[in-house]
């Protein structure tokens, strides 16, 4: 990805209805899943990129939602 992380974070925040708490919750949960072996839904190397950055890109690209994370934990 060639976007600056600030731009990606702003887009991800917009996707979460500008709710910073919700965004941080989704990023943390998705980063935990990635740390536990989940495959990134965007083209990133987990070993070369921060897991939180990967999660932000996934949210910004509509690959991950809070509702989707809740469903996978049930």
From Swiss-Prot:
Keywords: DNA-directed RNA polymerase, Nucleotidyltransferase, Transcription, Transferase. The RNAP catalytic core consists of 2 alpha, 1 beta, 1 beta' and 1 omega subunit. When a sigma factor is associated with the core the holoenzyme is formed, which can initiate transcription. Gene3D superfamilies: 3.90.940.10. It catalyses: RNA(n) + a ribonucleoside 5'-triphosphate = RNA(n+1) + diphosphate. NCBIfam families: PRK00392.6-2, rpoZ. It comes from Campylobacter jejuni subsp. jejuni serotype O:2 (strain ATCC 700819 / NCTC 11168). It is an enzyme of class 2 (transferase). Its EC number is 2.7.7.6. One of its GO terms (cellular component) is DNA-directed RNA polymerase complex. It holds the Pfam family RNA_pol_Rpb6. InterPro entries: DNA-dir_RNA_pol_omega, Pol_omega/Rpo6/RPB6, RPB6/omega-like_sf. Belongs to the RNA polymerase subunit omega family. Promotes RNA polymerase assembly. Latches the N- and C-terminal regions of the beta' subunit thereby facilitating its interaction with the beta and alpha subunits. HAMAP family: RNApol_bact_RpoZ. The lineage of its organism: Bacteria, Pseudomonadati, Campylobacterota, Epsilonproteobacteria, Campylobacterales. It comes from the Bacteria. GO terms for molecular function: DNA binding; DNA-directed RNA polymerase activity. This is DNA-directed RNA polymerase subunit omega. GO terms for biological process: DNA-templated transcription.
């Amino acid at each position: 990805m060639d976007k600056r992380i600030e731009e990606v974070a702003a887009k991800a925040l917009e996707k979460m209805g500008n709710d910073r708490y919700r965004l941080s919750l989704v990023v943390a949960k998705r980063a935990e899943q990635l740390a536990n072996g989940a495959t990134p839904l965007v083209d990133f190397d987990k070993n070369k990129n921060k897991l939180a950055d990967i999660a932000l890109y996934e949210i910004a690209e509509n690959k991950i939602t809070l509702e989707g994370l809740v469903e996978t934990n049930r």
